[in-house]
Amino acid sequence: MENNFDSMLNVSAVPQDDKKAAFIAKSKNNRNRCYELSEQITNEVASDSGKFQQYLDVQARFDRYTANNALLILAQRPDAERLGDYGYWREQGVFVKRAERQNPVLIMEPGKEYEREDGSIGTYYNARELYDISQTTMKERPQPQTELDERLLIRALINNPPASIVTAEPDQMPEDKGAIFEPEENCIYVRKGMNAQEIFQCLTPELALAGFADGDPEYDRDEDAFHAYCASYLLCKKYGIDTQAYDFRYAPDFFEGMEPQEVRAELSKVRDAANQISSRMAKVFEQNRMSQRQQEQAAQRQEGEQNRENGPKREESQSRTHMQGREPGQPRGNWQRREAAQER
């Protein structure tokens, strides 16, 4: 029988350099796409108050992402909830849907450093492809609604503050202020009688201002009032505090005349201010979790010890019950048969 496979075995080699070139071309296209999207969405955010608030919502959900990457997420998938690359989702036991593989969310990540002609050091940026949870095979799972204890929330908020915090009588405070930072005294005064949500809303912008002042008694609080206001919004969104009273209609006025790079710098300042406060809070939450875990472990150990102590007592009690009505040395069960015979 004629061998029909011979003609199949004449295959030209595919130069590996072609694969490398294709990868480099794709990476370059993705990087250029990120630059274009970033410029476009930055201009939209700076000129549209509604779009600006949308950006803040995205940044609140992805608080560990840079301001530029939050802008890129807003431009590509503003409703994203959870992002990861192929490897991340594979570790979760799910996969990116076939129809979504060509629709990644592009973000920028720092790569290698290089030396510029003037001797300064620059950083190459590479585009990375991510996918939202909605683009994967993971079935919808209801997210557990964990409500933070209000006292724990406020205790975390005032942990290691950049300025002293002192309560004040309502008549000692400005009528429209629940809290106010005084740079000359490096002190934040907080109106007495407020509930947890009011304290959080009023105290967060003042903590941000105190962080900006960094102990400078001549600091002008008006310089960063907008940044502090936005940082407060980010924190409220993150920790489930009502944000309906926040109004960003004047945001375009703040950004008027700025270049996209300048706008992103201002957004980064807001993001960093919120993260400084959130980082201090996270330490308190972690300490609380560790304390609860230790208490649970101690309770489990105590329960185990009680069970071990009660075990021999139960066995001893059962032994005494069986011995009742039996003469010494008499086999178990004989006394029952003897009493039954006597009755007969």
Give the predicted meaning of each segment.
Residues 1-323, 328-343:
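N-terminal accessory/interface modules of nucleic-acid-binding and processing proteins
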